[in-house]
C-alpha cells in the first residue's frame, strides 16, 4: 500500500520509489525533523556516511554526499535521479517527475501533486523537453541488454 502515492512495488511512480527513512543522532538531528521534499538514492549512502565519519569517499562511485539533507540543512540542488523500468525511463529533478514509455510522456510537479494525478506535459513543454533530453542521453550511456539465445 502506497497511501496517496501512485503505483507500488516494482513501479517507477512515486508509490514504488518512496521509502521512509529514519535517522537518530542526538545533538545532530532534530528529533521531530521531517523532510518529505528532498530525495536521495541508495547510491548516496556511502558518500554520505563517509562525509559524516570524516572519511574520504571513493572517487569512482555514482552517489553523492547528501548528509546535509539528513542534518536539516537547506540544499541548493541535488543531481537528478534516473530510473529505467516500468512504465519506462523516468527522471526526478527538483520538483519534477518525467516518464516516457507505455503511457506516453508524463510530467508531474510532485511538490504539489505527490499522487501524480495531473499530467502537466502540455502546460510545461520546455520542462518536459529538458528532462526528455537528459533521459535520452542517459539511456544511450546504459549497456544494451544481452539478447536471449534462440531456442533450437
Name the predicted role of every residue range.
Residues 118-126:
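Active-site-proximal N-terminal segment of extracellular/periplasmic enzymes that hydrolyze or transfer
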Residues 133:
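Basic, alpha-helical interaction scaffolds
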Residues 1-17, 28-111, 141-147, 151:
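C-terminal cap/loop subdomain of S1 sulfatases and analogous C-terminal strand-loop tails that border
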Residues 21-24:
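Short glycine- and hydrophobic/aromatic-rich loop-to-beta-strand nucleating segment
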Residues 137-139:
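Type III/flagellar export substrates
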Residues 129:
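Substrate-binding clefts and catalytic carboxylate motifs of secreted carbohydrate-active enzymes
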Amino acid at each position: 500500500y502506497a497511501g496517496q502515492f501512485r503505483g507500488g512495488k516494482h513501479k517507477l511512480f512515486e508509490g514504488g520509489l518512496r521509502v521512509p527513512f529514519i535517522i537518530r543522532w542526538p545533538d545532530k538531528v532534530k528529533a521531530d525533523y521531517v523532510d518529505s521534499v528532498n530525495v536521495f538514492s541508495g547510491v548516496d549512502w556511502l558518500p554520505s556516511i563517509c562525509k559524516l565519519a570524516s572519511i574520504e569517499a571513493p572517487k569512482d562511485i555514482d552517489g553523492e554526499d547528501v548528509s546535509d539533507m539528513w542534518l536539516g540543512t537547506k540544499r541548493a540542488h541535488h543531481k537528478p535521479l534516473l530510473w529505467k523500468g516500468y512504465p519506462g525511463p523516468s527522471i526526478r529533478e527538483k520538483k519534477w517527475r518525467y516518464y516516457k514509455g507505455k503511457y506516453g510522456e508524463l510530467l508531474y510537479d510532485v511538490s504539489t501533486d505527490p499522487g501524480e494525478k495531473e499530467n502537466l506535459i502540455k502546460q510545461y513543454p520546455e520542462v518536459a523537453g529538458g528532462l526528455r533530453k537528459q533521459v535520452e542521453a542517459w539511456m544511450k550511456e546504459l549497456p544494451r541488454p544481452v539478447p536471449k539465445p534462440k531456442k533450437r
